[in-house]
Design a protein with these regions (language model features):
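A short SAM/SAH-binding and catalytic strip from SAM-dependent methyltransferases
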Residues: 83-103
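A short glycine-rich, Lys/Arg-flanked "PGG" loop and its adjoining helix->strand segment in the class I
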Residues: 103-115
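S-adenosyl-L-methionine
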Residues: 1-23
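Core SAM-dependent methyltransferase catalytic element
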Residues: 176-205
Length: 205
């Protein structure tokens, strides 16, 4: 992934992410905020937004770029505040690592949301990659991926990441008692999701 992606200007933000940002409401937690692209945008629009990162380096970069409220924490260990919107962009829910981890992410998200709170994120169906590149499907869920970044010849630590297809997402969300809206799909099998814990039926399926 080009480093420039993490330092985009407003005019470089893709349509899917603009739609997601336009749906933010109330107090926002930007999870996996990176270098603060989305947090800065929301901040400039007058939102109260906390930018969370597990990377201390990323937190320092955000502070230097002018993000006001930076939280250095592991999302799954964080329980200090409640929010109206939990935002996971650039496939931020990938931090779940596995399908079972996604269930845990949904459970923990409920504990961080206000009564009318919402979860907004994007993901991708990567099943086409196995056919296009003739890769044998793994024994585990095909969207559970191992990653390793490289920058100028330096390799980072390997890490696990999750891409989840719509059918699997909806099945798990319903089992975990969430209401789901698929709001947008692009030509690259990437899609935008808005979810609320079931009980508030203001979202129609």
């Amino acid at each position: 992934m080009p480093i420039e992606v993490f330092f985009r200007e407003e005019e470089d933000i893709p349509e899917l992410e603009f739609i997601a940002l336009s749906l933010c409401d109330g107090k926002v937690l930007d999870v996996g905020a990176g270098a603060g692209v989305h947090a800065l945008y929301l901040q400039e629009k007058g939102f109260e937004v906390d930018a969370m990162e597990i990377s201390a380096t990323a937190c320092k970069i955000m502070e230097k770029r002018g993000v006001k409220n930076v939280i250095h924490a592991d999302f799954f260990q964080f329980a200090e505040k409640k929010y109206d919107t939990l935002l996971f962009l650039m496939n931020g829910i990938g931090i779940a690592e596995t399908v079972d981890g996604f269930r845990n992410l949904l459970k923990h998200s409920k504990s961080l949301l206000t009564d009318k709170g919402q979860l907004i994120f994007d993901s991708s169906d990567i099943s086409y990659l196995y056919e296009e590149y003739r890769i044998a499907r793994p024994d585990h869920y095909f969207g559970e991926i191992n990653f390793q970044y490289e920058y100028k010849g330096n390799l980072g630590q390997p890490f696990k990441w999750l891409y989840i297809d719509q059918q699997t997402l909806i099945k798990i969300a319903h089992e975990e008692n969430w209401v789901v809206q698929i709001l947008f799909e692009d030509d690259n099998d990437q899609f935008l999701v808005r979810m609320e814990p079931r009980g508030d039926m203001s979202i129609e399926m």
